[in-house]
C-alpha cells in the first residue's frame, strides 16, 4: 500500500481519526502511568482492555480488567513495558467482522464482503463468509471502510475490524494497512 497520513498500529491516533470521520469506536483513554489507569478504570466501571498504543496483535500487549475495584494497580504500566498505553472500554457486541478493501490511484474502491471472526484466547480462530449479519450492516461496514480510504487518500489494501451490536450498528475496533488476517 501507498500510505498517506496513516498512523496504523498506533491505537490512539487511529481511534481519534475514526471518531473524527464519524466512525464510532469504544470509549478510550490514553494511559501513561498507574494513576491514569486507576482513574480511567474508575470511569469505565472497573472494566476494560489495556493495550499498548503501538503494535501488539493476537492478544499480545494486552491486559483485561473485569469488574475490578479501582485500586491496587501499582506496577501495571511497568509490567506492560513502560510504553504508552490505551485503555478501551468493553463493548457489548454480538459478533466481530472485518472488511478488506482496496483503493486505486483513481480513487476507485473495491471491498470484499465482511467476514465474521471468532477468537480463542485472543487469537483469530476462524473467519466465515458470509458473516451472519444483515445486508444493511454489511453495506454500512463497507461504506465505513470506503470513508476511511477516501479520508486518508489511501491507495492500497486495508483491513478494518468492527464489532456488530445487537441493533446492527457498528463500532470500529482497529485498522490494518494491509490484508487483514481474516
Specify the residue positions occupied by each region the protein language model found.
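Conserved N-proximal alpha/beta basic substrate-recognition cap immediately N-terminal to
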Residues: 1-44, 48, 55-57
Amino acid at each position: 500500500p501507498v500510505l498517506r497520513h496513516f498512523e496504523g498500529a498506533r491505537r490512539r491516533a487511529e481511534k481519534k481519526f475514526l471518531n473524527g470521520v464519524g466512525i464510532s469506536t469504544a470509549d478510550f483513554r490514553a494511559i501513561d502511568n498507574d494513576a491514569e489507569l486507576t482513574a480511567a478504570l474508575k470511569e469505565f466501571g472497573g472494566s476494560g482492555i489495556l493495550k499498548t498504543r503501538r503494535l501488539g496483535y493476537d492478544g499480545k500487549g494486552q491486559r483485561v480488567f473485569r469488574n475490578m475495584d479501582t485500586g491496587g494497580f501499582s506496577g501495571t504500566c511497568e509490567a506492560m513495558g513502560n510504553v504508552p498505553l490505551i485503555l478501551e472500554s468493553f463493548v457489548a457486541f454480538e459478533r466481530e467482522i472485518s472488511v478488506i478493501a482496496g483503493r486505486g490511484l483513481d480513487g476507485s474502491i473495491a471491498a470484499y464482503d465482511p467476514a465474521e471472526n471468532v477468537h480463542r484466547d485472543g487469537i483469530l480462530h476462524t473467519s466465515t463468509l458470509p458473516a451472519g449479519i444483515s445486508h444493511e450492516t454489511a453495506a454500512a461496514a463497507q461504506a465505513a471502510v470506503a470513508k476511511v480510504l477516501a479520508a486518508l487518500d489511501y491507495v492500497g489494501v486495508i483491513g478494518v475490524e468492527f464489532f456488530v451490536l445487537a441493533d446492527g450498528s457498528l463500532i470500529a475496533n482497529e485498522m490494518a494497512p494491509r490484508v487483514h488476517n481474516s
